[in-house]
Regions:
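CN hydrolase (nitrilase-like) catalytic-core segments centered on the catalytic cysteine
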Residues: 1-8, 77-169
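Active-site catalytic loop in hydrolytic enzyme cores
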Residues: 14-88, 101-114, 190
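Short beta-strand scaffold segments in enzyme catalytic cores
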Residues: 23-27, 59-60, 125, 144-147, ...
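Non-catalytic surface loops within mature trypsin-like serine protease
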Residues: 29, 149, 178-180
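Short helix-loop capping/hinge motifs at secondary-structure junctions, enriched
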Residues: 32-35, 153-155, 181-182
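A short, polar/charged loop-to-alpha-helix boundary motif
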Residues: 39-52, 169-183
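Flexible mid-to-C-terminal extensions adjoining Fe-S/redox cofactors in radical SAM and related proteins
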Residues: 185-193
Length: 193
């Protein structure tokens, strides 16, 4: 609260009240409220190594900047989840992710870009970098965080507003104009919504 910012945290294994373990992302708003979004679709390796259970609810989180949606890693690969968030008014999707190799990263990246195009929204991907030797299923990481846009006039060339170097701790900043999304949805080259 003292810094007057909203924080979209990454996700991590969290023990639920009934004893299950879920992968949960937390959102801390500047008004002091805390929101949680469960990962709906755990990966096979999450199920195998950590016995992660999938959540069953996804919805927008109301912020003072408008509604946002959280798609944790693999959830970005399921178009129906993103469409539900877009139908609820989300114009920005946040995708915290943890991939161990370039192939896994590219799946999340390509699907996140598709979600930006399909739903005419912004997608902010933020991934883990560094290695954790001795921690099962977390020993290596591959990430290249980015801020993605629809592919149309008024937006960044190639649908990429900002992109980090691979496997480097860094901060990315981009100005995202939500009125450009309104324009795209009403006047754009394609109108998906």
């Amino acid at each position: 609260i003292s810094y007057n910012i909203n924080i979209i945290g990454g996700s991590h294994p969290t023990r639920t009240d009934d004893g299950d373990i879920q992968n949960v992302a937390y959102v801390f708003l500047r008004d002091g409220s805390v929101h949680a979004q469960e990962k709906i679709h755990p990966t096979p390796s999450e199920r195998h190594w950590w016995n992660i259970k999938g959540g069953d609810q996804i919805g927008t989180i109301q912020t003072d900047c408008g509604p946002v949606g959280i798609l944790i890693c693999y959830d970005s690969e399921f178009p129906e989840l993103a469409r539900k968030l877009a139908d609820e008014g989300a114009k920005i999707f946040f995708v915290p992710f943890c991939t161990d190799n370039r192939q896994g990263y590219m799946r999340v990246r390509y699907c996140s870009q598709a979600r930006a195009i399909e739903n005419q929204c912004y997608v902010v991907m933020s991934g883990n970098v560094g290695n954790l030797p001795g921690v099962e299923n977390m020993d290596i990481q591959y990430a290249k965080s980015c801020i993605l846009t629809p592919c149309d006039f008024n937006f960044a060339r190639d649908g990429i507003a900002e992109e980090c170097s691979e496997n480097v701790e860094t901060v990315s900043i981009a100005d995202l104009d939500l009125t450009d999304l309104d324009w795209a949805r009403q006047e754009g080259t394609v109108r998906n919504l």
